[in-house]
């Protein structure tokens, strides 16, 4: 049984980790930390977990965390980079759901997150945890940087095109929409139901923190620099991401083989579903599930490839992918604890 700790358990990704791990046959959560809610029973904050956990939130205790086999960080940026080195020295393995170890260029990280990085050595050693790309490296990693939600949907949608060099890498567009849970659980006026209900807007159009992460992943896939325009949008639903992706095909005759290319690329990936050409994936088809569903489109004789990619931002975009990474790290069935279908309606 894997002894698991969770640092930062009061946000949406924290409770999603608890929900998934509650029925995981090979993992036991032995501690969950929150400075603000120390002493509160987990089930008092999250009534859906009544009967599943007797744990109380506790202050972070290095000795308790050091007794874990694996620790998940579901914290704001800047926390994990300060705590991880001590855990690494104790031999604990870590999956960090924050952005602290995702970027390899630490000047870029500091520019986007407004503080200097305090753990350069571990930032270099961390494995970027997109299983569909880095499964072997994840298996041996001590520290895994769990990908962001938008970057997961965008990278999975673009990967086959860039890996095969079929599109112009300088002209990529990602038009993405997310539910409100992507903004976290803190009380913000702009996220009140009365503010976002019956409304729809772009945000971060001049630059978003996930842009350098997307660019880093797509550059690796293409083997050369990429130019990507990424614009996120907030839509009035709780969870889910839809990313509509556009790329310019170098040879329009390649359209005829794109469906087969995508199906071949993802045929052995348990959590990627390539739908029939021309389908329209719905966010509700992945709600609560660790899946990415995608479909290809073409408008008349255009040389523009359109890919629609959907995920649940809290599952494949956060906690589910983190548990998937844990499974890989401990040589378990990758799908363990993650087989539940999406919730409908």
Curated annotation (Swiss-Prot):
Keyword terms: Amino-acid biosynthesis, Arginine biosynthesis, Cytoplasm, NADP, Oxidoreductase
Catalytic residues identified in the record: 149
Its EC number(s): 1.2.1.38
One Pfam family matching this protein: Semialdhyde_dhC_1
Entry's Gene Ontology BP terms: L-arginine biosynthetic process
Pathway stated in the Swiss-Prot or TrEMBL entry: Amino-acid biosynthesis; L-arginine biosynthesis; N(2)-acetyl-L-ornithine from L-glutamate: step 3/4
PROSITE patterns in the record: ARGC
This protein's GO CC annotations: cytoplasm
UniProt subcellular location: Cytoplasm
Reaction it catalyzes: N-acetyl-L-glutamate 5-semialdehyde + phosphate + NADP(+) = N-acetyl-L-glutamyl 5-phosphate + NADPH + H(+)
UniProt entry tagged with the keyword Cytoplasm: yes
Top EC group: oxidoreductase
GO MF annotation terms: N-acetyl-gamma-glutamyl-phosphate reductase activity; NAD binding; NADP+ binding
Keyword Chloroplast: no
Transmembrane segments annotated in the record for this chain: none
PANTHER family, per the entry: N-ACETYL-GAMMA-GLUTAMYL-PHOSPHATE REDUCTASE, CHLOROPLASTIC-RELATED (PTHR32338:SF10), N-ACETYL-GAMMA-GLUTAMYL-PHOSPHATE REDUCTASE, CHLOROPLASTIC-RELATED-RELATED (PTHR32338)
Family, per entry: Belongs to the NAGSA dehydrogenase family. Type 1 subfamily.
Function: Catalyzes the NADPH-dependent reduction of N-acetyl-5-glutamyl phosphate to yield N-acetyl-L-glutamate 5-semialdehyde.
Protein name: N-acetyl-gamma-glutamyl-phosphate reductase
Organism of provenance: Marinobacter nauticus (strain ATCC 700491 / DSM 11845 / VT8)
Gene: argC
């Amino acid at each position: 049984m894997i002894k698991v700790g969770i640092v930062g358990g009061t946000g949406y990704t924290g409770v999603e980790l608890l929900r998934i791990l509650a029925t995981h046959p090979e993992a036991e959560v032995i501690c969950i930390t929150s400075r603000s809610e120390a002493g509160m029973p987990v089930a008092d904050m999250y009534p859906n977990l009544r009967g599943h956990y007797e744990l109380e939130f506790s202050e972070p205790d290095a000795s308790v965390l050091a007794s874990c086999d694996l620790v998940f960080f579901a914290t704001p940026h800047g926390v994990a980079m300060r705590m991880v080195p001590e855990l690494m020295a104790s031999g604990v393995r870590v999956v960090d759901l924050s952005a602290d170890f995702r970027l390899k260029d630490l000047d870029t990280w500091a520019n986007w997150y407004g503080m200097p990085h305090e753990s350069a050595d571990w930032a270099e050693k961390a494995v970027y945890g997109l299983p569909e790309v880095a499964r072997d490296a994840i298996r041996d990693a001590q520290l895994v940087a769990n990908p962001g939600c938008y970057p997961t949907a965008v990278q999975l949608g673009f990967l086959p095109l860039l890996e095969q060099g079929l599109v112009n890498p300088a002209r990529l567009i990602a038009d993405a929409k997310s539910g409100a849970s992507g903004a976290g659980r803190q009380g913000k006026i702009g996220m009140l139901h009365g503010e976002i209900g019956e409304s729809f807007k772009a945000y971060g159009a001049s630059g978003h923190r996930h842009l350098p992460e997307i660019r880093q992943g797509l550059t690796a896939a293409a083997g050369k620099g990429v130019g990507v325009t990424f614009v996120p949008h907030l839509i009035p639903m709780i969870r889910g991401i839809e990313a509509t992706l556009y790329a310019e095909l170098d040879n329009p005759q390649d359209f005829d083989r794109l469906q087969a290319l995508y199906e071949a690329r993802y045929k052995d990936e348990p959590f990627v579903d390539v739908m029939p050409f021309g389908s329209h994936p719905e966010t509700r088809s992945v709600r609560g599930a660790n899946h990415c569903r995608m479909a290809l489109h073409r408008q008349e004789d255009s040389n523009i490839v359109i890919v629609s990619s959907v995920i649940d931002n809290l599952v494949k975009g956060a906690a589910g992918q983190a548990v998937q990474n844990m499974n890989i790290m401990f040589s378990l069935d990758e799908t363990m604890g993650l087989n539940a279908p999406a919730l409908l309606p």
